[in-house]
Amino acid sequence: MLDFDLVLFGATGDLAMRKLFVSLYEIYTHYGFKNDSRIIASGRKELSNEEFLTLLCEKTQLHSREKGREFLAHISYLCVRLDNPKDFEELSKIATKNKPLIFYFSISPSFFATTAQHLAKNALNHANTRLILEKPLGHDLKTCKEIFQSISVFFKEEQIFRIDHYLGKKGVQNILELRLNNPILNILWDQISAVEICVYETLGVEERGEFYDKIGALRDMVQNHLLQVLSLIATDLPNNLKDLRKEKIKVLKTLQPPKDFKKQVIRAQYQGYRDENKVHKESQTETFVAIKAFLDTPKFKGVPFYLKHAKKMPHNQASVKIHFNAVNTLEFFLSQDKITLTLKDHQNPLILETHNKQEFLRPYAKLLYDAIQNNHNNFAHQLELEASWVFIDTLIEGFMNNATPLYSYESHHLNESEFLKPLYQ
């Protein structure tokens, strides 16, 4: 039975309704909550408990699921306007101090500093307090640091959990699990010749045109998800997993800026992107990006890491393919629990199984559970973010200076091998 209180800012928003409440329900069905554990849903709208629960049930159908009504009994609603100090005073009257108190910031980063300040002023930044922060955590290195500095006045690094749902995916979890539990693979790890990290989507920007046009594929996917996966592959495994984040920081700090943009970076935009709703008619935003990156470490010096992400592709793909010197390949499928090992002397790939046979929580549920347990392993440290932004900023500067042209590609018909030929030469 889990014992905690969670305050969810932005409880009436899209993410909360689509992912967060369902994930909390999933945790409840797996582990149970103590009777006095509470989920305090917070939003700007003035709603009664009954009105909010009606809205929640309309969006999620939780009331019709097994144990759904039991779970809903843990939820109450409180109107908290983030710019209203009196609302935080009301929150402080019902928030607990004798067990983990988790604040989930499912709100715009522009409200992070104000919200953190109000929590601190009302003595809600005690030793049991934890903050879960949603991306985007900055637009570049400068804004990333500014966000952290505005919060760190009131909360310590060990109280902050920066959520990246990719780190909760079973396929990503398998990377670390396989490395920890297979000594033979660790021998192979010294013989890696190339790594391909790929996330392709058939969908376009859909209803996110205005948001996406400001960030593009590089910021949306590479800066966080793909670089986090890279760090899990390239890090030296510590004796204590609590030191994993320190090792990942070391790896990300060794990312080398491109020496030849045109041979190391390809960017493109799908045809028709500029006709999407709320997208600028002369937009230079990339919907396809492929990077040939290098690390300056003894083990991986000269080993290319291909980071690839695109929208409106012919097929969906989320995978990590590791190539070894002896023509062997190891492939992780990030959206499913599947790992294949292809050996040069075997005609058919070997399907590897992971040791963890327990039913796996979905990404947001897995990460919420980790935060409740005060486990930071699957959350990025501030220094990880800063190291990744140092690398990404060099690419953004290159884009702004047109160091590599913005190509165009036909939706769902891109010939990947031909398009990426400069990277693999």
UniProtKB/Swiss-Prot annotation:
Catalyzes the oxidation of glucose 6-phosphate to 6-phosphogluconolactone. This is Glucose-6-phosphate 1-dehydrogenase. GO terms for biological process: glucose metabolic process; pentose-phosphate shunt, oxidative branch. It comes from Helicobacter pylori (strain ATCC 700392 / 26695). It holds the Pfam family G6PD_N. NADP(+) binds at R44, K135. Its EC number is 1.1.1.49. Keywords: Carbohydrate metabolism, Glucose metabolism, NADP, Oxidoreductase. Coiled coil: none annotated.
